[in-house]
Amino acid sequence: MTVFAAEQQFHDAERPLPSHQARLACRAGLAETTAGVAPGFVQGNLAILPEKYAAAFHRFCQLNPKPCPIVGMSDVGNPMIPSLGIDLDIRTDLPRYRVWRDGELVEEPTDIVAHWRDDLVAFVIGCSFSFEEALLADDIPIRHIEEKVRVPMYRTNIPCAPAGPFSGPMVVSMRPLKPKDAIRAIQITSRFPSVHGAPVHIGLPQSIGIADIAKPDYGDPVPIGPDELPVFWACGVTPQAVIAAAKVPFAITHAPGLMLVTDLKNKHLAVL
């Protein structure tokens, strides 16, 4: 069953919110991309760290609001974040996780119950899937949704401001757009600073350190038409890259493209 079919199935069930239904699907073992799931609701990237590193990571996010806009944070040792959703359990409610030890990816489980500890702090970081709803509403096509794959993401040569052990380059997501749509996309996404805001770069991927746009570092490649430009947004996978580079003894993140679906409304994130 695809995530799109599963979402429709849960829409038909007697559940209070599509976002809650999506989390229940993940809790039941569904492990697919969440792009296009629960339209209207905010999705988030995930970073979980021991309390020892939480303050420095929080500072890193404050210094780098484009790639790392925090939309929610747990109390120490508490896997529930009530401000983000009904019955939301950070240990079970994402499709897939990544477990890191000393900067190395060691496991990609569908839940982290066995890995949870009393000293962990969870950060939920804004995701570009939220502004995609606004783009679609303006008839701007989103290629990875059309192709039913994960958005392509790339490490760049754009530096992030360091904080404590956390430093490194920005990761960006890419959507191919025709020039007229790219201009409109800048206008639309500028209204959503808490989910990455306006693009950080348009065209010429080599100038931001992307050697081969057909080979993303995360996610899946998508076709780019001859009349289209690659448009790049700051991406919430950036924390994943800097956590790995910092080689902290233990950390957990989401698997790229497989996000936490919250009960927050996208429309409430717009600033204009």
UniProtKB/Swiss-Prot annotation:
Pfam family, one: D-Glu_cyclase
Annotated SUPFAM superfamilies: PSTPO5379-like (SSF160920)
Keywords attached to this entry: Lyase
InterPro entries, alphabetized: D-Glu_cyclase (IPR009906), Putative_hydro-lyase (IPR038021), UPF0317 (IPR016938)
This protein's record includes keyword Lyase: yes
The keyword Ribonucleoprotein is annotated on this UniProt entry: no
Gene3D superfamilies: PSTPO5379-like (3.40.1640.10), PSTPO5379-like domain (3.30.2040.10)
Record-level Gene Ontology MF annotations: lyase activity
EC id: 4.2.1.-
Protein family per UniProt: Belongs to the D-glutamate cyclase family.
Name recorded for this polypeptide: Putative hydro-lyase RPA1747
Organism: Rhodopseudomonas palustris (strain ATCC BAA-98 / CGA009)
